[in-house]
């Protein structure tokens, strides 16, 4: 099958971006080009390969196709070579070429719309080993991910030792990010003074959960939103209120959002940089059997009074779980990967997250599940791979026409 240059222009662009990666291997001993390695791993992951052995098998099986746009000097590497070379790549550089590629194919139709960056940790359970007679204990790979609602992709990540290390990792990650016109969200574990200060220092906003780990502050906010206060807000005499309702065959779920700018009553307000509002979300579940369950979550924020922006930030926070972490487990079988080289696994996960974004773009046209799209590619690699990159090129072309 002859490939037209225009059909794989986005694929060649991806290769060109990969050629920008620094190669830390010893010169004179390099057999395989680093960009060949990266592009093959990307295409293999798109084609339903999750493990290093599967990636090497893909390269051998599809060698004739790959040679149409890659050099493949030195032949086809082994699974161990793929793992080793990927482990040597600078993770930030790798992530940057992927974010730049996605930005090229996505049209931001409202530059004034605030992006929501959700920070959350994920554990890859297959990457650990218990201590044995001849085996040292190896801990799980823990990663702090930053998910962009606007780009619908993970735009940054940091390897951490334990889940609790998210707290200290967040300021370091924030230093790398442009937070202009951005709202940062995270769960209550990470609601710390240093973290909100880091957001404000980079020009961003925050809307973050508050729980008992903040002691008196949590109790004070909880006491403020008593039943009388909620009635005042609902009646429009203070703050803002919004109600939404969802129905399914088992229950009716009601969400009530309360936000107020009255925060000067709190004596330590200056300790929380940029604090301008506090809020509450009350979720009520009315089940079909007549039982009712109610829960309340409390929030602090640098946002001015705007219940639509406030409620949207809270809802969109869960995208990091639903659209990223769940897909990494369900579609890419992350917990099944037993790679012990943490850097190799970390970089492979960066590649998988990039592939997830590509597949989500393709899904808009294919109208199939991500798993089915990957299966389709694996059954007819050349045809389906070309089709995917043609679609990405078409998205790119439509962006150019819209921007004129």
Name each model-derived stretch.
Residues 29-97, 189-192, 199, 355:
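Short, positively charged, Gly/Tyr-enriched micro-motifs
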């Amino acid at each position: 099958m002859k490939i037209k240059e225009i059909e794989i222009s986005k694929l060649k662009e991806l290769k060109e971006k990969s050629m920008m990666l620094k190669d830390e291997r010893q010169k004179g001993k390099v057999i395989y080009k680093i960009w060949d390695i990266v592009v093959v791993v990307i295409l293999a992951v798109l084609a339903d390969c999750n493990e290093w052995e599967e990636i090497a098998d893909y390269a051998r099986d599809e060698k004739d196709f790959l040679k149409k746009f890659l050099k493949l000097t030195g032949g086809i590497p082994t699974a161990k070579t793929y793992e080793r070379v990927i482990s040597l790549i600078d993770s930030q550089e790798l992530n940057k070429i992927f974010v730049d590629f996605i930005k090229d194919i996505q049209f931001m139709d409202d530059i004034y719309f605030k992006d929501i960056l959700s920070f959350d940790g994920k554990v890859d359970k297959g990457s650990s080993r218990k201590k044995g007679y001849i085996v040292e204990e190896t801990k799980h790979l823990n990663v702090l991910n930053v998910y962009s609602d606007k780009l619908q992709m993970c735009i940054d990540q940091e390897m951490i030792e334990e889940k609790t290390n998210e707290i200290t990792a967040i300021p370091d990650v924030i230093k790398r990010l442009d937070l202009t016109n951005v709202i940062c969200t995270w769960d209550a574990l990470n609601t710390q003074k240093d973290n909100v200060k880091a957001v404000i220092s980079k020009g961003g906003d925050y809307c973050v959960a508050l729980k008992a780990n903040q002691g008196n502050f949590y109790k004070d906010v909880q006491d403020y939103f008593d039943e009388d206060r909620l009635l005042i807000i609902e009646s429009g005499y203070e703050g803002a209120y919004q109600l939404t309702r969802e129905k399914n065959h088992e229950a009716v779920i009601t969400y009530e959002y309360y936000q107020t700018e009255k925060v000067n009553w709190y004596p330590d307000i200056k300790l929380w940089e940029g604090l301008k509002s506090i809020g509450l979300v009350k979720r009520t579940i009315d089940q079909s059997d007549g039982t009712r369950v109610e829960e309340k979550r409390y929030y602090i924020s640098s946002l001015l009074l705007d219940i639509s922006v406030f409620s949207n930030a809270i809802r969109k926070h869960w995208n990091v779980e639903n659209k990223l972490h769940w897909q990494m487990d369900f579609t890419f079988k992350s917990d099944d990967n037993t790679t012990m080289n943490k850097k190799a696994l970390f970089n492979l996960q960066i590649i998988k997250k990039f592939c997830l974004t590509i597949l989500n773009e393709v899904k808009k046209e294919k109208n199939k599940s991500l798993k089915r799209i990957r299966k389709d590619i694996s059954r007819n690699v050349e045809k389906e791979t070309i089709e995917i990159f043609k679609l990405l090129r078409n998205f790119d072309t439509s962006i150019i026409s819209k921007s004129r």
